[in-house]
Amino acid sequence: RLAEPDRYTREEALINGPRHVPVEMGEADEGLRFEGGHDAYLSSHGLTHARRLELTSDGRSRTGEDMLLAIEGAEKRRFDKVLSATQLKGVPFDIRFHLHPDVDATVDLGGAAISMALKSGEIWVFRHDGTHNLSLEAGVYLEGTRLKPRSAQQIVLTGYAMNYATRVRWSLSK
């Protein structure tokens, strides 16, 4: 979230951002692994966001897992309070994957996947574990050499956190 503009410089500082951003990289069974997270939603929702990515050695497949976690007692109490405010419908969240403007993406397999055609002719497919809603939405691409943003698309996984641990698994493969 941005603060009110400074009265002299008109700059807007980022506030309420993450304070703790752990990152770890290493080897996975079939390639490389990245694990990271942040606590930006801790004070507002009691949730820590963690992400695990694995990339196969041949570069043809990437799997991911996003997690929203209420870990300690105070965090669980904060999450319970936010969950109660939703009348137990769940805390809404979106996971967004922004695509380059040159990627031609379409919803495929009856809404279970997104197929992406690259200019090179390669086809990549995004799939998820089926526990949340998958959609394709309009987005923008900011390019340093252009004065205006370019139209693009973004893959969006939408869901509701109902428990102290919410997991969303997805993959991107050729």
Protein language model regions, located:
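CBM-like, beta-strand-rich accessory domains located in the C-terminal region of large
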Residues: 1-174
